Amino acid sequence: VKADPVISELPVADPISYDPHKTLNEASISGGAVIGVSGENITGTWSWADDSTVPVVDVTDYDVVFTPDDQKHYNSIRGTIQVNVLTANVNIADLPTASAITYGDSLAKSVLYGGTAYFDGINKVEIFGTFAWKDDSLKPFVSDSDKTLYTVVFTPADSVNYNTAEIEITVNVSKAAMPNLLLSVDNTHKTVGSIALPG
């Protein structure tokens, strides 16, 4: 009957960045120690229990298997190690466009439309999400029109595995209409009372 070795020290995995097409097979395993029935170190290899798994940021524990070189006398043994998966950066392929506003309006009145983001990893992947003004309370002047850059933040729909990204765009600001300066005066008058003057 083959014996079960004992893990005295688990191996460690190198940190990797998230990639929807990157499996655990891309994460290197190193170290680890296994001992036999007599306390001797057993040589062998560590591998992922399922190397087709795509590691994600919010899952840290993954199973590994130690396969001894002496498979005649020892069974394989399984353990669990942690993998540090880093959030991935996205690139903005096409900038969004801002709708025009009128002087006096804040950026909140300017609607952002269009724009695309992607992740350039093992394969290029389009990333879905939303664009929004970083500070939509700002009120541009007409002199800022199509010239001053304002920061827009892209928030990925998958905010767990991808970082936000910031870009800068301009906005068209038109002059506000002059207020009506004509005053409407009521020409009627009312008698509120009378007094007798001394004579």
PLM region descriptions:
Residues 2-39, 84-123, 175-199:
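Solvent-exposed, low-complexity, repeat-rich "mucin-like" stalks and linkers
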Residues 26, 77-79, 109, 165-167:
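Short capping micro-motif at the N-terminus of alpha-helices
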Residues 35-76, 81-83, 120-161, 169:
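Serine/threonine-rich, repeat-prone extracellular segments and beta-strand-based repeat modules
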Residues 74-76, 93, 162-164, 181:
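Short acidic, gly/pro-rich beta-turn/loop elements at beta-sheet edges
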